[in-house]
Amino acid sequence: GYPDGNLDLRGTLTRAQALVMLDRAFGGLPAPVGDHARTAAGMQGFSDAPVWGGEELSRVLSSGIVAGEADGLLHPDAPVTRENLQTLLSRVYALEGTNCKDDFYETVNKTWLDSSDIPAGLSVNGPFYGLSLTVTEQVAKLISDIAAKPQTPGTPEAKIKALYDTVMDVEAREAAGVAPIQEYLDAIETAKTISELIDVECRLQKELGLSTILGFGLTSDFEDSNRKVVAFSSFGASMTKDFYENGTQEQKDAYLAYLTKLLTLSGLSEQAATERAKLVYAAEAKVAKASYDPQEYGDVDKINNIYKLSDIQRQFSKISLAKVYEASGLAPSDRILVTDPGAMRAAASYFNDAGLATLKALSRTAILMSVGGCLNQGFIEASVEFTKAYYGIDMTQTTEQIAAQQVQGLLADYLGRAYVEAHFSEKAKQDAEEMIHEFLEIYKTRIEALDWMSDATKQKAICNLDTMKIKVGYPDSWETYLDNADIKSPSEGGTFFSNVISIQASAKEKTLAEQNTPVDKTDWLMEPFTVNACYSATSNDITFPAAILQKPLYDVNASREENLGGIGYIIAHEITHAFDNNGAKFDENGNAANWWTEQDYAAFQQKCLQVANWYDGQEVYPGIACSGALTISENVADLGAAKCIVAAAKKLDHPDLDKLFRAVANTWASTTSRQMREYLAVTDVHAPDKLRCNRVLQTLPEFYTTYGIQPGDGMWTAPETRVSVW
């Protein structure tokens, strides 16, 4: 009751009162540890917290479950709704992690989450993400073993050793500083007209293979997947659209400090660097405002914009695009793709003498961002400092780690072959291929049983499955363009920078040769040592590199149910991408085409809208919620994957669905900083990892049956609200 002796049941419950009641109901809340400590909210305290709350309110606030408002205050006297109470209750379930019926993900993963850490050099940790670190270490060992002994000149091993040695030659890189790019920086600095700056841009493209403010390249032709199309791009935003529109002042200051640091490292005074950093920021913000939202870049209807060179030239009337096109080395083409016309128009407004200072600042900054890491350590340190300030993540690496990472990225085709020979089993390849074929049959059965799709559209969908190409482990043939790269050791006069430029030249030569030749659809989009998987709509294929086919996602000694909840979920997810809101716009040949009846597509769009609503606003960490619109394509894939792996498990005699569902939870266990969670919530087209477990499982009747989940439990949702597409 109240001090006056009354109970006052009709009074409005305030935020502070609700928090005190919460503490009393649970007998005191634990202090957050591990992942909860990293993602806790309100740990700085609230200046308007009422004194009367005493230790009870203090305990709740120190548990990290109170996010407060945008102004940084608690607003203790604000009224609390039933929805507010449910949100607080869900946060407590997550913090406690003691009941599968209330928060499955947190309960299954509690021991791991509470004891988790983030190793230096890793932005996110978890069984899935940690596998990337394991593979990186495996590849680094291959590289260091090769670099430790003499190699036969001209062999892949000799090039690996030479590149590694130049990265490790820190003393030489420090002594050289920005000398390798000084002539280009000077040329930018002395350009007095927009025409002169474009001449520098053309020179950069020809001599270094760099496009800094605009350029042409090749990409997939959405209308004919058997050919490439020329693509035009102009400078864009280095950060996310949300950053420029909604970023905090602290975040913006961190980015400006990073830009300023890069520019001072290139030889500018602090004052000049600060001024140019502001020019870069303003231009990027303008382009970002005119750009598509992140999820729109997956929509072929929005990004397939074909222009003639003369059409683009009208946007850039003060410069010669013909000169820039010639510098690209591409053969003439009357079809040029522009993925984001709004961003292009915003950038074009700077291509005149009035925008010269901004373009010069952009060009200089772009060079430094592109090749600064090949020069002295200051550029690497600046990046590490920014990452820590902006994302709350320590990406510090030893010189050996940096060298191995650079060699892995630049000589990936050589190392992919070596990785497969050392770390991949044919048994894993065979098991994955068998699982894929089984899933394809399950999908056919499920599609045939759909009650919202006509037979005509079903046959088209099944055709997409029948023609889907499967890539597992490694490619049938290996790329050879690196054989043409002139990679020299320090003793031969080679430097990290010169070797990078030589590799880029070889890659460009390969790209130019592809312009007027049929697309080789046996090419891989990923390296064998990549811990990821993908579906390509323009090839209608699924790719599962060797590195992902190992523990903890796949284990030859694990139960069938556990492998289904690990690698099975990922395989089924990629297959479903052929039928998400983006993949559904491509046919069996990888061409953008409408294979739907009008009525069926309308029904599909309604299904997708339901999926967006199912996820939208779902809170994962205090004050951090999911965007249904941003994540719709990945969520459709997740939901389809869950249906598929449950169907596969139910074909077993006496399937252990508890093992299956726990494996799903284990797969998506992850930890990172709160800043990174906030960043991913507005940029990542995947739902937060916790929702890839909980929100997906909440759509499965088998999940409720397995754990006896009933109304009133935290994981319960009414059957009529649960969504399903495939």
Regions found by a protein language model. Give the residues of each.
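Feature responds to low-complexity, polar/acidic, surface-exposed segments characteristic
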Residues: 1-55, 66-82, 89-95, 454
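Sec-exported extracytoplasmic/periplasmic mature domains
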Residues: 2, 23-31, 61-65, 90-94, ...
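Stable alpha-helical elements in mature extracytoplasmic
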Residues: 3, 15-22, 42, 52-56, ...
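Second-shell loop/turn segments in exported
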Residues: 3-9, 45-47, 73-76, 125-126, ...
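Active-site-surrounding "flap" and adjacent substrate/cofactor-binding loops of secreted or lumenal enzymes
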Residues: 99-103, 107-168
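Short, solvent-exposed loop/turn elements at domain surfaces
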Residues: 112-116, 239, 552
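Noncatalytic, helix-rich "gating/capping" subdomain that lines the substrate-entry/channel surface
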Residues: 143-438
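Intrinsically disordered, low-complexity linker/terminal regions across diverse proteins
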Residues: 337, 341, 397, 408-412, ...
